[in-house]
């Protein structure tokens, strides 16, 4: 199909123009992604074999450092699920539909969530498997959804009832939606920025110059 040809060309480009060109040694596989970020994550999870833990990281966050990785690995061994983040610096307002301030949450309890987001492999794989399966069918959950002891059966059923209405924005949310495992917050870094806008790129360039 045309879509398959596009994916094939993209994978070949990544292999030749990025991995081989720059001599990266730690890339074991380049995996075809999906329509949304979380679909791509699931594709990656299915390709992993024999892992105890998995760190899921945004490629748009190039300033990840070794200490953040170490803190994540230490935490996941104890808690099964953790995410990097930092306390917010600004006051946050919740907006209503007309962009008036509806509420002001306690800033001392708010964190900006980053990546990596780190989990026991079996936990995050089973949670994602149910999430993706729930999107792909319209039958009753008892008949169709895979169930694992790591998951909360009532939450699984609720997901199926609300299919199409759940908007997943990070990996921890999948664990929160479908399990009773609390997600530990681990210190990231204010420099662990996500490059999304032209302004972010300018900040990233300044950070690169500082590190040189």
Task: Place the predicted regions along the sequence by residue.
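Short, small-residue-biased leader/transition segments that mark boundaries at the very start
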Residues: 2-7
């Amino acid at each position: 199909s045309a879509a398959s040809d596009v994916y094939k060309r993209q994978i070949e480009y990544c292999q030749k123009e990025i991995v081989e060109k720059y001599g990266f040694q730690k890339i074991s596989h380049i995996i075809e992604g999906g329509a949304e970020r979380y679909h791509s994550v699931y594709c990656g999870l299915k390709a992993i074999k024999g892992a105890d833990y998995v760190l899921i990281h945004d490629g748009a966050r190039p300033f990840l450092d070794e200490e953040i990785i170490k803190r994540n690995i230490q935490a996941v061994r104890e808690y099964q699920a953790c995410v990097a983040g930092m306390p917010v610096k600004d006051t946050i307002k919740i907006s209503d539909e007309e962009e008036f301030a509806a509420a002001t949450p306690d800033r001392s309890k708010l964190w900006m969530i980053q990546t990596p987001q780190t989990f026991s492999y079996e936990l995050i794989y089973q949670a994602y498997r149910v999430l993706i399966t729930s999107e792909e069918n319209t039958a009753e959950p008892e008949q169709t959804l895979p169930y694992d002891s790591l998951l909360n059966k009532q939450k699984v059923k609720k997901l199926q009832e609300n299919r199409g209405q759940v908007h997943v924005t990070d990996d921890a949310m999948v664990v929160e939606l479908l399990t009773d495992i609390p997600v530990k917050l681990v210190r990231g870094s204010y420099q662990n920025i996500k490059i999304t806008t032209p302004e972010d790129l300018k900040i990233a360039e300044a950070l690169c110059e500082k590190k040189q």
